[in-house]
Swiss-Prot record:
This is Protein phosphatase methylesterase 1. The keyword Chloroplast does not apply. Residues 1-49, 402-427 are annotated as: Disordered. Coiled coil: none annotated. Belongs to the AB hydrolase superfamily. InterPro entries: AB_hydrolase_1, AB_hydrolase_fold, PPase_methylesterase_euk. Pfam families: Abhydrolase_6. Its EC number is 3.1.1.89. Demethylates proteins that have been reversibly carboxymethylated. Demethylates the phosphatase PP2A catalytic subunit.
Length: 427
């Protein structure tokens, strides 16, 4: 290189901006790498592998890394996600009773091509969006499936008022009431959607929701269309034991949040929900902003006051194990740990009365922590109980008759169970 060329190159290099500090293209992961990766089915190579490395002085490399962070689906954002990303529509179903007017709110993606309908019931203090990410994954595996995820009474956007509309009615979250609500919602959805008959149904309930769907399955009020039911992380024995410490747990929870983002952050940092994507869609439905907050710096409060539900706690879970084992239809119990099994269910498991699946890496909200795995288990569970795919073998008598006819035809003989009119017969 000539001296003239060298001096020209030095002059150009001197005008370039300072070298950008190096940083990894890999975005921050959720708080628990194992849960986060399995929740999305996405495996991100470790930074040490440097699969997309660029030279430190390369401006293109810096831009590439920036774009990767901005567009990567596993970003550490606490921005809320809308329900429309997971369901196709919402319904408001009005139920009139002697003392109240209830507006049930549900999220719906209708089934297609004779697909099944997964009816989802959340746990206490949660909402229908607790199943949002799981519903999305179910549809990826089984596109014809429908999802009906409800907001239970006094949860989410479901509201209960007196007949005059002047005030709220007394809180009633008894198992019997929640049972009637769920049956009404399914039937009213059928009417609203103009379905001539109900599609095949798989009931899915988490925690309190597990008790409700088991009660519905046991009483058979939705008829033979209920193929099966799945209970997520609740059994009678451990639930009754946990009630003793419920008040202490509630006293340790924050009562207010400065913003929705801080509410999402608390759920993920406390590991109440271990999947940030699910928290971003489900947590906003658990909170509402007070018009005149007592603490203006923290205007967001819980939509459902769990402490007020205490009178119903035992009513939800007493007799759950017995009903779960006795109800008609396929049975699935999905737990976050085998230590949750009580004696009755352990015996039932050894007798092969139900399917047991355990996700030890998940917390209590298994469908939120592990939506991909939960969806796969639920779809496989449906397929095992799908009557439309069942081909019954021919009866033994029919098989014997068919074999005899074939043998007689090959030998030119008359079938053993009938002779022609002109045939002779000796006793």
């Amino acid at each position: 290189m000539s001296e003239l060329q060298k001096s020209f190159a030095k002059a150009k290099l001197a005008k370039l901006p300072p070298e950008a500090p190096p940083f990894s293209m890999h975005p921050p992961r959720d708080e628990d790498d194992s849960e986060s990766a399995s929740s999305t089915g996405t495996v991100v190579p470790s930074p040490s592998r440097q699969l997309f490395a660029r030279s430190r002085g390369s401006t293109c490399g810096v831009i590439f890394r920036l774009l990767a962070i901005l567009t990567h689906p596993r970003s550490n954002s606490v921005e809320t996600l809308n329900w429309t990303d997971f369901f196709t529509q919402e319904l408001f179903l009005i139920q009139e009773t002697d003392s109240a007017r209830i507006t049930h709110h549900v999220y719906l993606t209708p089934p297609t091509n004779s697909g099944p309908l997964f009816v989802m019931h959340h746990g206490a203090g949660s909402s229908g969006l607790s199943f949002a990410t799981c519903a999305e994954e179910i549809r990826k595996i089984l596109p014809k499936a429908g999802i009906l995820s409800i907001d239970a009474r006094d949860h989410g956007q479901t509201s209960t008022y007196t007949e005059t509309g002047e005030g709220k009615v007394e809180l009633d979250l008894s198992l019997e009431t929640l049972n009637r609500d769920l049956v009404f919602i399914v039937r009213e959805t059928q009417s609203k959607m103009g379905w001539e008959s109900l599609p095949d149904i798989v009931l899915v309930g988490h925690s309190l929701g597990g008790a409700v769907i088991t009660d519905v399955a046991k009483k058979g009020e939705l008829g033979p269309k209920v193929l099966a039911y799945a209970v997520l992380d609740v059994v009678e024995g451990s639930a009754m034991d946990a009630l003793q410490s419920m008040e202490k747990y509630l006293s340790t929870r924050p009562t207010r949040f400065p913003s929705l983002a801080s509410g999402i952050e608390w759920h993920t940092r406390s590991r109440t929900i271990r999947n940030r994507t699910s928290a971003r869609v489900s947590v906003p439905s658990l909170l509402y902003e007070e018009a005149a907050p007592t603490d203006p710096s923290k205007p967001w409060v819980w939509r459902t006051n769990l402490a007020e539900t205490k009178p119903f706690w035992e009513n939800w879970f007493i007799g759950l194990s017995k009903k779960f084992l006795e109800a008609r239809g396929g049975k699935l119990l999905l737990l976050a740990g085998t230590d949750r099994l009580d004696k009755e269910l352990m015996i039932g498991q050894m007798q092969g009365k139900y399917q047991l699946q355990v996700f030890p890496e998940a917390g209590h909200f298994v469908q939120e922590d592990q939506p991909v795995k939960t969806a796969q288990v639920l779809v496989d569970f449906y397929k095992r109980n799908d009557r439309s795919a069942l081909v019954l073998p021919p009866k033994v008598a029919d098989m014997q008759a068919s074999a005899a006819m074939k043998q007689g035809a090959e030998a030119g003989a008359v079938p053993p169970f009938g002779r022609g009119q002109g045939s002779s017969h000796k006793p």
